[in-house]
């Protein structure tokens, strides 16, 4: 961004103001976003400036937290801390983040978001008035003319809004999303689409719409090498249907950057790979496929009414299954992985909240998913139903859960039922359903996996038996775990003694089932444990040493067994006894580590060698200010998606890192 002789650039979570002195740049000031919804340096998703020299910064810190801050010079002093009213978002507020620079005219600020009914918003800085001018979700920055504001949507439609009458004209131009700002010259509008075509709109026009379109979704650089085979795909959030979160692909230093690309969304799932593509699902409803080898965008789809759905895609046999949750409606959607075209969708209920990233699991031709039911709002009606802040009780006094709720749930609302759905993979028709409400209330804090042709399901009901009794809820059980025939839904065994305790799914290997979690399993104790059950009988094999917590999943490799703790130690277990062999003082937040033996991979490509008692052998580049996501190894490459900073990157390793240069050097 250039304003006069001042160059404004984002760098490392700051905003740098460089003065062009004619012979050299001189740092004039460094702008920092003040503490709000966190302290870490945020990512900049867009910068703009007005005629008075004010700089507008759309930033994101974590988990939907961000806003458009205004920086300005008063004399030689840079003033920060002001922001455009109505642009602030976080997990407790109603509204999604924006990922684009704003357009400014006087005191009016125009801003797009990938959010239904709030696609283009007009903010008045003086009156604080907010007007929704278009409901179509968008990430392409709006462009102002004398009488209109123009933007392209994620649906491939160009929209022109009259600033006086607020009337809107729509032109469906593209098969792909329009993600870049339009250009305007000589009364004509030029719009580039992700379908690979440049479109022109205007009168007169002597150009015709293209009859033969580019096949932009086709692979141009397929994977090659000894690990390109599908059996080496990291095809679901936890690596495979057993939830093992581990593989062995001869990972070793040194690492080398292969490619990097921007991501206009927030995520909490790990990269998913299959068919030569890497797939990403943003919490705002975008599903994106890129070429694994180069990072080139292949296709992007956006579905309305998705709201903070931190869920993972699943790749299986040319199909992509993605749970997309929202407060208005939720669907598991099945897409053609090659084109992104929708094949079928099936409704479900509930909120994935922070930590239920898992997509469906598949047994034969049956796709199975677990969730809850009940009522949700941006903020819950009781403290246990919230993630901080003051509860908001509906006028009718009903119980409402925050859509992004606490990780510490002693009990759940009365109308929350634990649910399981099974659909035909080819048609989306229901094969069977289960509701476990007779055993307890809850459903969203759960886990599923498949081992040896059997489905395993575990759910948490809360640990506060006394409060559940007073509220008229079932008190006998704090949770349950069961083994199910995935074809019929028949229960093969069930126990109420051992169960996940939120923020963790199930994992299984060699006839054993592994259960972790974040919460206490029952009132009166602060200890947490990992349980190991016999997968054939449900009987306890061992209880681990006490741990701070066991988040996300217990990673179970051929040799090593590992779990992370929230702001605590990561632990390496003896898989035969549950004894902690040694601990790693990672002090990460809720990092979703993965294992590619003998290493575990953390945030910012941290590579920790478990065969050397947790030695850090490689790290970086540090592209993310948060610690929520680790990297994965798939098909002989490393893939990493930043939770906060809007990047997806890939690295090569070992001998390949010497021979395969970054993609941008060989184009």
Predicted feature descriptions by range:
Residues 20-21, 202, 246, 292, ...:
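Short, solvent-exposed loop/turn and secondary-structure capping segments
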Residues 20-23, 72-76, 124-128, 162-166, ...:
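Short loop/turn segments that connect beta-strands within beta-propeller blades
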Residues 203-213, 654-661:
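Short, charged low-complexity linker/loop segments at the C-terminal edge of domains
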Residues 209-224, 230:
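Non-catalytic propeptide/linker segments at domain boundaries
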């Amino acid at each position: 961004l250039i304003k006069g002789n001042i160059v404004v650039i984002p760098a490392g979570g700051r905003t740098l103001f460089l003065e062009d002195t004619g012979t050299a740049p001189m740092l004039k000031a460094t702008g920092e976003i003040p503490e709000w919804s966190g302290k870490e340096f945020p990512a900049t998703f867009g910068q703009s400036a007005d005629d008075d020299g004010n700089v507008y910064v759309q930033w994101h810190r974590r988990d939907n937290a961000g806003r458009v801050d205004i920086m300005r010079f008063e004399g030689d002093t840079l003033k920060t801390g002001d922001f455009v009213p109505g642009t602030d978002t976080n997990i407790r507020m109603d509204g999604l983040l924006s990922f684009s620079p704003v357009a400014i005219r006087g005191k009016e600020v125009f801003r797009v978001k990938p959010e239904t009914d709030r696609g283009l918003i007009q903010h008045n800085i003086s009156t604080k008035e907010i007007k929704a001018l278009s409901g179509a979700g968008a990430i392409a920055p709006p462009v102002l003319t004398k009488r209109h504001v123009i933007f392209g949507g994620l649906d491939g439609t160009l929209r022109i809004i009259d600033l006086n009458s607020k009337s809107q004209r729509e032109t469906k131009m593209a098969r792909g999303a329009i993600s870049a700002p339009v250009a305007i010259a000589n009364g004509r509008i030029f719009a580039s689409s992700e379908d690979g075509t440049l479109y022109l709109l205007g009168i007169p026009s002597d150009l015709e719409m293209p009859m033969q379109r580019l096949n932009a979704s086709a692979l141009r650089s397929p994977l090659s090498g000894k690990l390109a085979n599908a059996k080496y795909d990291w095809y679901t959030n936890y690596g495979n249907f057993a939830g093992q979160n581990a593989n062995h692909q001869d990972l070793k230093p040194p690492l080398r950057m292969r490619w990097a690309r921007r991501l206009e969304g927030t995520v909490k799932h790990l990269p998913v790979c299959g068919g030569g593509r890497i797939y990403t699902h943003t919490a705002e409803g975008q599903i994106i496929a890129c070429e694994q080898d180069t990072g080139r965008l292949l296709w992007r789809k956006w579905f309305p009414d998705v709201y903070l759905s931190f869920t993972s895609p699943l790749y299986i046999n040319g199909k992509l299954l993605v749970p997309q949750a929202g407060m208005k409606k939720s669907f598991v959607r099945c897409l053609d992985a090659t084109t992104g075209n929708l094949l079928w969708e099936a409704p479900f209920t509930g909120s994935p909240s922070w930590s239920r990233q898992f997509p469906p699991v598949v047994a034969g031709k049956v796709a199975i998913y677990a969730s809850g039911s009940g009522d949700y709002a941006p903020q819950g009606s009781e403290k246990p139903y919230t993630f901080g802040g003051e509860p908001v009780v509906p006028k009718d006094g009903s119980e409402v859960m925050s859509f992004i709720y606490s990780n510490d749930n002693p009990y759940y609302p009365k109308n929350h039922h634990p649910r399981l759905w099974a659909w035909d993979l080819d048609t989306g028709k229901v094969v069977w359903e289960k509701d476990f409400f007779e055993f307890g209330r809850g459903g969203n804090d759960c886990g599923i996996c498949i081992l040896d042709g059997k489905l395993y399901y575990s759910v948490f009901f809360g640990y506060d038996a006394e409060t559940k009794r007073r509220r008229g809820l079932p008190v006998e059980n704090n949770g349950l775990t069961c083994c199910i025939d995935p074809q019929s839904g028949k229960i093969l065994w069930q126990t109420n003694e051992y169960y996940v305790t939120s923020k963790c799914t199930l994992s299984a290997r060699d006839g054993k089932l592994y259960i972790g979690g974040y919460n206490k399993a029952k009132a009166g104790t602060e200890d947490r444990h990992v349980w190991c059950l016999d997968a054939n009988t449900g009987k306890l094999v061992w209880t681990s040493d006490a741990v701070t917590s066991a988040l996300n999943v217990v990673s179970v490799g051929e040799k090593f067994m590992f779990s992370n703790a929230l702001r605590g130690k990561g632990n390496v277990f003896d898989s035969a006894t549950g004894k902690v062999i040694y601990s790693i003082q990672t002090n990460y937040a809720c990092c979703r580590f993965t294992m590619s033996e003998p290493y575990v991979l953390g945030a910012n490509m941290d590579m920790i060698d478990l065969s050397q008692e947790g030695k850090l052998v490689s790290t970086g580049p540090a592209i993310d200010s948060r610690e929520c996501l680790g990297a994965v190894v798939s098909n002989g490459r490393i893939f990493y998606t930043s939770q906060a900073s809007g990047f997806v990157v890939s690295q090569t390793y070992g001998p390949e890192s010497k021979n395969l240069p970054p993609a941008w050097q060989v184009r």
